[in-house]
Amino acid sequence: MSYFPWLTILVVLPIFAGSLIFFLPHRGNKIVRWYTISICLLEFLLMTYAFCYHFQLEDPLIQLKEDYKWIDIFDFHWRLGIDGLSLGSILLTGFITTLATLAAWPVTRNSRLFYFLMLAMYSGQIGLFSSRDLLLFFIMWELELIPVYLLLSMWGGKRRLYSATKFILYTAGGSIFFLIGVLGMGLYGYGSNELGLDLERLINQSYPATLEILLYFGFLIAYAVKLPIIPLHTWLPDTHGEAHYSTCMLLAGILLKMGAYGLIRINMELLPHAHYLFSPWLVIIGAIQIIYAASTSLGQRNFKKRIAYSSISHMGFIIIGIGSITNIGLNGAILQILSHGFIGATLFFLAGTASDRMRLVYLEELGGISIPMPKIFTMFSSFSMASLALPGMSGFVAELVVFFGLITSPKFLLMPKMLITFVMAIGMILTPIYLLSMLRQMFYGYKLFNVPNANFVDSGPRELFILICIFLPVIGIGIYPDFVLSLSIDRVEALVSNYYPK
């Protein structure tokens, strides 16, 4: 047992080191860039070391626990700990943030603030995935919003203020329900004179049926905004259409996954009876979302928005996996969280770099750019294939495991299972249609248009490095998913066994 405060260091290091950026000498952006990338790398290496040497995969309990009294007056503790559910998400956060920092190399305007906000976001995300106290979870959830809002409103497209305001209104609106749920849970357990927010205690807490359903619904609204679940998804295409591509990488790669993580960590673990009641609805919503977002994506002219809708469609698989209440389904949802984290982030990075070079985002104005930009074309095609679940890539394995999870679920009858599977299959047919038509309109054809001031430069070594770094895990998970599944499999088994008592 290691008593070294690994997780506290992992949570606090980025934001503290980030605040020192403002004291660096004003000699261009070079120092700031190298400083930020080295902080991200150091954090990622520390994380990998701590998990390799101090985390036992076979143990389904919480590990690397830390508990420090913080605010004595209402018994608020700084409680951290990780298990198989959060391990993959934390590693994904470290990986994507490091590459997003490298992707933000061309940012020169207010670069100190930009990099500080990215590091602040990093701290918030790792704090969220490792917190073991409900109030701390909520604080980290909120801490995330401020950097994202500033990154959107200061570095973005023409309508950036509109999309940033829309984002903050949606997420803050969802957070109100979250806070009510947190207070309701804390006050119910310990009478009205003190709050009990320790997740370990709350797991064994039982609630009256009506209260549990109300709490579940409150949390669900907050996660439905983040995840996003239709009809609370409309902030996402606007945000992705306007944000700088390194911000998009963090949004698609990590921010959306926080909603899925909260759904598993709080709704499934702490409110099992309500989740058992709501799970058929989750599966139905997930299936509708896959088809709805895929068909909406087909009608988008802006290719960034088209990729944003494909993100929403892929989140449907996570919702179905969580709603299936089976070992296989939940493992599939966790696999899809990681798989889409890699694929979604890269597609936005590619879309951003391509639109920066061409200064165009509408598909009908594009065509024939595969000739001047063969590397971007190759990588765009490869990641589109990964997104449409080509066998041998991570998207295929994740969706297949979710399928099996739904089919083997003892909770649903045969007819509903067949119906949902049929709907999912239609969604999987629509995915290649909108992705391949986007590729055709962008890269094929003869319109080597004469755009003034467009510099058709193919991707340089820095961009290729980012793309190859993400391509390797996508292929790796596709060929040998067991490595990722072994992180969460024991924890998931312990969680699902609560639903089907022996």
Curated annotation (Swiss-Prot):
Enzyme class of the recorded protein, top EC level: translocase
EC number: 7.1.1.-
Subcellular location: Plastid, Chloroplast thylakoid membrane
A single GO cellular-component term on record: chloroplast thylakoid membrane
One GO MF term: ubiquinone binding
Membrane topology listed for this record: Multi-pass membrane protein
Segments passing through the bilayer: 4-24, 37-57, 87-107, 113-130, 134-154, 167-187, 213-233, 244-264, 274-294, 315-335, 336-356, 388-408, 419-439, 464-484
Matching InterPro entries: NADH_Q_OxRdtase_chain4, NADH_Q_OxRdtase_chainM/4, NADH_UbQ_OxRdtase, ND/Mrp_TM
Chief localization: plastid
Coiled-coil portions: none
Biological process, per Gene Ontology: ATP synthesis coupled electron transport; electron transport coupled proton transport
Pfam families: Proton_antipo_M
Top-level taxon: Eukaryota
Sorted UniProt keywords: Chloroplast, Membrane, NAD, NADP, Plastid, Plastoquinone, Quinone, Thylakoid, Translocase, Transmembrane, Transmembrane helix
Catalysis performed (reactions): a plastoquinone + NADH + (n+1) H(+)(in) = a plastoquinol + NAD(+) + n H(+)(out); a plastoquinone + NADPH + (n+1) H(+)(in) = a plastoquinol + NADP(+) + n H(+)(out)
Cross-referenced NCBIfam families: NDH_I_M
Stated family: Belongs to the complex I subunit 4 family.
Protein name: NAD(P)H-quinone oxidoreductase chain 4, chloroplastic
Gene: ndhD
